[in-house]
């Protein structure tokens, strides 16, 4: 049975939590990051080989020349409250959400 939450007005809804971001579909626009105040995701680099690398790390310094685009990465899934705001603003539909059971 999925988790049920309530609005302030008492209406029931089922939170859908961010489970995954498809780095191949993500365009790195940052819209999801802007609407989420919970530190659920952050901007990373994607290399030619498909490796997702966090900025400011030793790994980033090693592969910086190989980064082909910047993408959002799920870095704080435990902070997601299941509101779905990120999905509503995503133009590339690169996120997977699911209810908890």
Curated annotation (Swiss-Prot):
SUPFAM superfamilies listed in its UniProt record: alpha-helical ferredoxin (SSF46548)
Molecular function terms, GO-annotated: 4 iron, 4 sulfur cluster binding; metal ion binding
Q: How is the cofactor bound?
A: Binds 2 [4Fe-4S] clusters.
Q: Origin, by domain of life?
A: Bacteria
Q: Which Pfam families match?
A: Fer4_10
PROSITE patterns according to UniProt: 4FE4S_FER_1 (PS00198), 4FE4S_FER_2 (PS51379)
Write out the residues that bind [4Fe-4S] cluster 1: 26, 29, 32, 36
Cofactor(s) needed? [4Fe-4S] cluster
**Binding-site list for [4Fe-4S] cluster 2:** 80, 83, 86, 90
> Which GO terms are recorded in the biological process aspect for this UniProt protein?
nitrogen fixation
The alphabetized UniProt keywords are: 4Fe-4S, Electron transport, Iron, Iron-sulfur, Metal-binding, Nitrogen fixation, Repeat, Transport
Keyword Nucleotidyltransferase attributed: no
- Asked if the Swiss-Prot or TrEMBL record annotates the protein with the keyword Signal, the reply is no
The cross-references to Gene3D superfamilies, in alphabetical order and at most eight, read: 3.30.70.20
Any idea where the 4Fe-4S ferredoxin-type domain is?
A: 17-46, 70-100
PANTHER family noted in UniProt: ADENYLYLSULFATE REDUCTASE, BETA SUBUNIT, FERREDOXIN III
- What is said about its interaction partners and assembly? Homodimer.
Q: What does this protein do?
A: Ferredoxins are iron-sulfur proteins that transfer electrons in a wide variety of metabolic reactions.
Protein name as it appears in the record: Ferredoxin-3
What is the originating organism of this protein? Rhodobacter capsulatus (Rhodopseudomonas capsulata)
